[in-house]
Amino acid sequence: MTDSSPSQHLFADVLARVHRACAALAEEGALPSGLDLARIVVEPPRDASHGDMATNAAMVLAKDAKAKPRDLAERIVTKLRADDLIESADIAGPGFINLTLKLPVWADVLRDVLRDGEGYGRSAIGAGEKVNVEYVSANPTGPMHVGHCRGAVFGDALASLLSFAGYDVTREYYINDAGSQVDVLARSAFLRYREALGEDIGEIPDGLYPGDYLKPVGQALAAGHGDSLVKAPEAEWLGLVRAKAIGMMMEMIRGDLAALNIRHDVFFSERSLIDGSADRVAETIGFLREKGDVYEGRLPPPKGAPVEDYEDREQTLFRATAYGDDVDRPLKKSDGGYTYFASDIAYHKTKFDRGFHNMVDVWGADHGGYIKRVQAAIKAVTSGKGTLDVKIVQLVKLLRNGEPVKMSKRAGDFVTLREVVEEVGSDAVRFMMLFRKNDAVLDFDLARVIEQSKDNPVFYVQYGHARGFSIFRNAREVFPDLPEADAERRQFLGTADLERLSDPAELGLLRKLALYPRTVEAAAAAHEPHRIAFYLYDLASEFHALWTKGRDLPHLRFIINNDAQITRARLALVQGVVAVLASGLTVLGVHAPTEMR
């Protein structure tokens, strides 16, 4: 039986005890030896009145044990009731086991938080494994718009979450600077260059980028080249103008991302795949051809819905169907150039060659149909050693008081990311972009996200952190020597009699703190940072509820002027809450204010 785990927290501890109970039964012959215990989970019960934790151990082992789940549960419960951590163990329904832990356990949880501070919840489950998270990767053809915003925030938060869970993360941006869209960018910039020289260019022709953001590119070209390019043939100026425009657009994009506290470690140019000393796309196609995964052939006409890249001709094809895709995929266009898919295969091969066997790509909703072919390609180029998880982020509907927001004049046909950040701040944007699962459409209301109410999640969570520090400031009437510095304050409060925290509301907060490390690990494993946002809102809600309770019931107030012991214990609880709120907000890239203005 296997029960090894890098997890070090209360839920992992209880899971290990369940494993040991099963191992003891196996030694006694009451369970077969060699059972896989990986399917056993220990989680919070759906109904808090049923206990502190629940396990499915009997349910998942019953078949292999050739026993009824309830009968097996009885045997497991007998072992668990003898455990020094467990107050009671009861069987529910068809064989679930509900566990209630002894009260001193919760004081120990708080001691862990006070010891680790904002580091509480950090995990080693990643074991230093290298992970490449690619996100944003917007075409370098203009400023970031609100549609890019969600993927940028999601990818950045996921990278932070994976780092917090012990992975060695590289954050990557793939610059799409080799497709036809950058030639359109160059022609659009050339028009602005002529405008900068004094020419009346009139209306921007259809097919070119109309936004005013290209005017500075035109002005820079005019300043650097005068009118020397005006009469030159396109073949002479296209590459020069394209490089200048891409460079200035990427500078703009980096600024947009910085405004939202988005960072990347690597900016990888698509053009570098073919413009360097070697044509890496050709090398990749050759590599796959040697494996028998590339051939010259003709695709049959598509059945039902048309395939967007279908052409009835002899062409170079990747044998995608051998790796789970629906059809084989073209690697070259009719003009002899590479398809975007061919470049994508080569790009992902470079990731694998750089040591990334674990890859995550964050894509927009319009790329959903592209997943199978890229995953098939990765299986082929890595001989099954590489994995790719594609996270699709759905659309963002930008509203103000429930009404759609008008488009940006500067950008031409969209609302820029910078405009949104300047209006509501990066914290509101980041938290709200994560307060819904990535594959669900998100309504982002500019009016709602600046409201100071429970209905505004980012305010409610940040206010929870600020409220904790307000309590600390007020507590100096009882403890004038309560330290300002975090580490010293945690040490000061760590000497409190934490067992005095026995009210159901206080114990509820302690249980919620105990859940944080498990939430971190589950969110990291599922690549779902929204779980952290949901957790923080729940924690803040319970904290605010306890504060409100104390306003109505004086004996539950955090500060009791004539009882220094209970005040110190409750301040320790407040310290635990603000530490975890700060930890989670940091993972999400959101500030944890000590006061709200």
From Swiss-Prot:
SMART domains: Arg_tRNA_synt_N, DALR_1. This is Arginine--tRNA ligase. SUPFAM superfamilies: Anticodon-binding domain of a subclass of class I aminoacyl-tRNA synthetases, Arginyl-tRNA synthetase (ArgRS), N-terminal 'additional' domain, Nucleotidylyl transferase. Belongs to the class-I aminoacyl-tRNA synthetase family. It catalyses: tRNA(Arg) + L-arginine + ATP = L-arginyl-tRNA(Arg) + AMP + diphosphate. Pfam families: Arg_tRNA_synt_N (PF03485), DALR_1 (PF05746), tRNA-synt_1d (PF00750). CDD domains: ArgRS_core.
